[in-house]
């Protein structure tokens, strides 16, 4: 409702490549349909033999197409970022992505016994970063009845950390924040967000740009939706 998506669409040009990440599928359609001069595609699980949206997205990027997808696929693109496939893209994220969220909780005994001592997982002592061993990757189908496939998937994207030896936390990967020619996060209010605190913790340089005209327009629209009325029972008692 603030007009930032419309402003973004109006500023696309055919000289640059874009990967746009939006919160909802309806907004994916909006970017594809609204960008008349610059053609965008969206991932489709029926596009490839593999039959996943990730494979479709990876194929579009490999071919240098402008792509729009949801936040759901964002963290899955770590392998592409590390391989340098995003280096020619301007990455635009509509709304602040999740910086950290709980993935799973297990007892220290379970983690030590089934994951670490058996050689399926390595945990960095300083950062808590969780990495699967090649053994887990190779044997994942054989051990999926005991070891969490969800934990494996997150660990393979370098975004999983172990907190207090029991809580698995999914953290926004630094490699995605450093990928591409630029990374832009569009949000109504950046200050006070967890993302800024995270960027400062990582030591990454960033710049905050404000669109005063757009913000004032949003304030006026919001004010027009608010009606203030007296409650007679309260007013009469004052």
For each of these PLM feature ranges, what is it?
Residues 3-4:
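Conserved glycine(s) of the Walker
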Residues 7-45, 72-73:
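Conserved Walker A/P-loop ATP-binding site and its immediately adjacent core
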Residues 17-19, 34-45, 65-66, 81-83, ...:
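Active-site regions of enzymes building and remodeling cell-envelope glycoconjugates
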Residues 21-24, 68-71, 93-95, 185-188, ...:
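Short His-Asn-centered micro-motif
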Residues 27-31, 50, 192-194:
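Short, charged/polar "capping" segments at the starts of alpha-helices
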Residues 37-76:
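Inter-Walker segment of RecA-like/P-loop motor cores
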Residues 73-206:
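Signature of the SF2 helicase/ATPase Hel1-core->accessory helical subdomain module
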Residues 181-183, 188-238:
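Conserved helicase/translocase motor-coupling segment
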């Amino acid at each position: 409702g603030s007009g930032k998506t419309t402003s973004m669409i109006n500023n696309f040009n055919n000289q640059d490549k874009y990967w746009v990440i939006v919160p909802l599928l309806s907004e994916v359609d909006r970017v594809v349909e609204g960008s008349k001069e610059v053609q965008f595609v969206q991932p489709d699980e029926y596009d490839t033999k593999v039959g996943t949206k990730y494979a479709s997205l990876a194929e579009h990027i490999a071919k240098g197409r402008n792509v729009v997808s949801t936040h759901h696929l964002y963290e899955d693109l770590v392998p592409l970022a590390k391989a340098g496939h995003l280096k020619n893209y301007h990455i635009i994220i509509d709304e602040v992505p999740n910086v950290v969220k709980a993935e799973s909780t297990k007892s220290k005994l379970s983690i030590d016994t089934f994951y670490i001592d058996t050689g399926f997982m390595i945990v960095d002592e300083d950062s808590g970063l969780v990495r699967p061993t090649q053994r887990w990757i190779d044997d994942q189908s054989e051990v999926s009845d005991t070891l969490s496939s969800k934990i494996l998937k997150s660990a393979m994207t370098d975004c999983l950390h172990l907190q207090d030896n029991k809580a698995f936390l999914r953290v926004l990967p630094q490699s995605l924040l450093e990928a591409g020619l630029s990374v832009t996060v569009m949000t109504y209010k950046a200050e006070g967000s967890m993302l800024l605190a995270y960027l400062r913790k990582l030591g990454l340089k960033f710049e905050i740009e404000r669109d005063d005209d757009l913000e004032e327009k949003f304030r006026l629209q919001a004010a027009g939706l608010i009606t203030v009325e007296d409650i007679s029972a309260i007013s009469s008692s004052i």
